[in-house]
């Protein structure tokens, strides 16, 4: 111990411990995480050297908060890249001090605990040298050392400009460096725009993104022979999990997590270049079923906006098929209230909409969101059996939930795979295989058009555009006439048009997109917004990727999804604003403003309560999620909750969250509702800054059940007439 104490009191011990913490440990961790690139190491050294020269002779109590925050950023980087494949942004930073958000995001644990332990150990070692060496003088660093950060940052900047690299940001940058570079670029763009002056931006041509295109050559000689339609949406599955897709684009990703689905793909038509336009289940379902882009900016989901409209919803696929004689059905493994699917699905044309409450079979494993995938598909098989008994043709849309965080799988799967996420995917693959094999034995595949796809992509670390890479596997009775690989760029906006075109039914002009059952001899425009990046392909070989709103890189790329693309340069100014203008125009396809629309999330449904609240998301009693509130607006909320059982009280909590972080609105922590004295509230709050992804979580517990007869939300500008009082109930955003 005395030898260690003497070493810790050496004059250079504090400097060496700081170098270990901010230079050696980050470089080693980058290598261990598999993020090894010359630019990444250069960025680590630049940030580390800056910390060394800045903190070496500072008092320990000044340096410690800086180093703790730096270490927290490093941990957050690894965790967020592991979870969703992107670096944290400035809007994420304040979430790091929210314990509930951290717990919900990590499932109570870290994806990379060794990284956190290494940083903590190095930080404790540095602090020990500071405390033991108190009173000892610190030698000044040579003047040449002060130039090291400048030289390293300049070298990184020069390398990026002389030999541009389009790799993932976390492979090229240390997070503080990336945030600094982004801020500098923003200031540069603002200066350029200030020098240009106020220039009115012309409206870009939108026909290529919004019009129906049926000009391709039909793949089928006659209208499709299928009697029924089955759409299976798999939660979060990227296109790279299908072997045929990987081979078609030459992907380096070779993990075969879904071998069964890949074997089914050998029997069907695959579309390798298939674009998912946004994150979130409700947005993916809207694009699929209503032939339109959902918001490309985290605004109010268009499915919620659709509740205010009584004409556009009739153009959605379920309504169109119902009009042509189909019975239309929606079944998912989770509860329906979250994201208001209990209201949206009937409104767009489903005759029957069912969630967790429909299932009578037991789960095979505990899962907070609802049915595990094996139990779900067993229930879905019974549902199809009921549909087969009717004479009417049917359309059934299925949505799984088992591959949603937190990933759950049986113990034997967890032993077989490296991560719970992979185990959950493998469990889904086996369950889906058994379901499809059962349909084949029952003869369902002989007269049913089956489309297997995903609602969104949970991404894959190190796979280019994985967050936007979807898949579309089509199994049709006339499969021999269809190609195994469908060449061309398609996306979720094409699905409704495609199915109507398959049956040779008229396609409403309100829909967008191309038909998967036609061969086109020209490119097409298409967009996506995932992982904070707006992406646009102009249909003429140029793919652009923009950090919102005014800074873009562009590449030469024949299609949208590709293993690699030829980097051509960067641009800002008018071309970048035109891409943003296209996204803005798509966002306004339903409503021109988020103001003055009353959303009614209440209903006369009886909702059983649990003995305790387990999860703010899965236990939500209403679907008021991911709303948008403009800057300077005023939001008013009115609610009525009644306990159904006269002998039982219901204990109610109301929380507000923005981007999943709690927002304090001054509401009571807990309230009571009884049959004789319902809980009635009417409150409002200001929006001094824009709010997006704003959600209400109405939670309850007790031994009885409740009725949420009213949960009205309206956002308006101060001084406007209060629509919440004046609009009749039958003109509000609610479905029948």
Please provide the spans of the model-predicted regions.
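Membrane-interface segments at or immediately adjacent to transmembrane helices
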Residues: 101, 153-233
């Amino acid at each position: 111990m005395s030898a260690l104490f003497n070493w810790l009191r050496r004059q250079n011990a504090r400097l060496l411990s700081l170098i270990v913490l901010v230079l050696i440990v980050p470089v080693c961790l980058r290598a261990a995480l598999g993020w090894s690139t010359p630019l990444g190491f250069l960025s680590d050294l630049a940030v580390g050297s800056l910390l060394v020269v800045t903190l070496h002779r500072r008092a320990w109590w000044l340096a410690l908060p800086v180093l703790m925050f730096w270490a927290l950023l490093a941990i957050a980087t690894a965790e967020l890249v592991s979870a969703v494949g992107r670096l944290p942004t400035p809007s994420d930073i304040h979430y790091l001090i929210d314990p509930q958000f951290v717990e919900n995001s990590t499932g109570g644990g870290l994806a990379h605990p060794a990284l956190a332990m290494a940083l903590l150990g190095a930080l404790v070692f540095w602090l020990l040298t500071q405390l033991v060496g108190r009173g000892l003088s610190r030698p000044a660093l040579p003047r040449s050392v002060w130039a090291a950060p400048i030289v390293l940052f300049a070298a990184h900047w020069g390398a990026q400009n002389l030999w541009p690299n389009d790799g993932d940001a976390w492979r090229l940058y240390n997070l503080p460096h990336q945030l600094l570079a982004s801020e500098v670029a923003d200031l540069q763009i603002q200066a350029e725009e200030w020098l240009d002056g106020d220039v009115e931006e012309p409206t870009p041509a939108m026909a290529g993104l919004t019009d129906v295109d049926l000009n391709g050559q039909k793949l089928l000689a006659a209208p499709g022979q299928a009697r029924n339609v089955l759409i299976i949406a798999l939660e979060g599955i990227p296109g790279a999990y299908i072997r045929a897709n990987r081979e078609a684009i030459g992907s380096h990703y070779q993990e075969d997590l879904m071998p069964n689905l890949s074997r089914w793909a050998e029997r069907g038509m695959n579309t390798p270049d298939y674009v998912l336009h946004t994150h979130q289940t409700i947005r993916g379902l809207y694009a699929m079923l209503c032939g339109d882009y959902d918001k490309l900016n985290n605004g109010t989901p268009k499915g919620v906006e659709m509740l205010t409209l009584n004409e556009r919803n009739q153009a959605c696929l379920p309504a169109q098929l119902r009009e042509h004689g189909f019975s239309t059905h929606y079944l998912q493994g989770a509860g329906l209230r979250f994201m208001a699917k209990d209201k949206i699905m009937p409104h767009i044309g489903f005759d029957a909409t069912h969630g967790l409450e429909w299932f009578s079979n037991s789960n095979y494993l505990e899962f907070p969101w609802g049915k595990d995938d094996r139990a779900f598909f067993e229930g879905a098989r019974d549902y199809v059996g009921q549909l087969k008994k009717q004479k009417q043709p049917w359309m059934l849309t299925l949505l799984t939930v088992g591959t949603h965080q937190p990933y759950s799988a049986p113990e034997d799967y967890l032993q077989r795979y490296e991560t719970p996420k992979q185990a959950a995917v493998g469990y889904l693959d086996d369950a889906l295989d058994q379901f499809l094999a059962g349909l084949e034995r029952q003869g369902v595949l002989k007269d049913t058009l089956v489309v297997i796809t995903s609602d969104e992509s949970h991404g894959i670390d190190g796979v280019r555009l994985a967050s936007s890479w979807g898949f579309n596997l089509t199994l049709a009775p006339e499969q021999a006439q269809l190609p195994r690989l469908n060449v061309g760029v398609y996306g979720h906006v094409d699905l409704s048009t495609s199915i109507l075109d398959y049956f040779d039914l008229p396609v409403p002009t309100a829909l967008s997109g191309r038909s998967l059952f036609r061969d086109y001899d020209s490119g097409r425009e298409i967009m996506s917004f995932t992982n904070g990046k707006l992406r646009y392909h102009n249909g003429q070989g140029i793919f652009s990727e923009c950090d919102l709103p005014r800074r873009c890189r562009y590449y030469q790329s024949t299609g949208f999804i590709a293993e690699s693309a030829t980097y051509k340069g960067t641009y800002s100014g008018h071309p970048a604003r035109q891409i943003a203008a296209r996204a803005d125009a798509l966002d306004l396809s339903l409503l021109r403003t988020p103001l003055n629309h009353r959303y009614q999330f209440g209903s006369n449904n009886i909702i059983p309560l649990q003995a305790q609240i387990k999860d703010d998301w899965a236990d939500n009693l209403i679907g008021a999620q991911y709303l948008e509130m403009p800057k300077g607006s005023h939001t008013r909320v009115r609610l009525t909750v009644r306990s159904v059982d006269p002998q039982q009280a219901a204990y109610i909590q109301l929380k507000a969250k923005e981007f999943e972080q709690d927002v304090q609105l001054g509401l009571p922590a807990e309230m009571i509702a009884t049959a004789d004295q319902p809980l009635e509230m009417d409150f409002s709050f200001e929006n001094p800054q824009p709010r997006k992804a704003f959600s209400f979580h109405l939670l309850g517990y007790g031994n009885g059940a409740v009725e949420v007869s009213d949960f009205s939300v309206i956002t308006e500008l101060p001084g406007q007439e209060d629509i919440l009082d004046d609009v009749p109930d039958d003109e509000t955003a609610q479905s029948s």
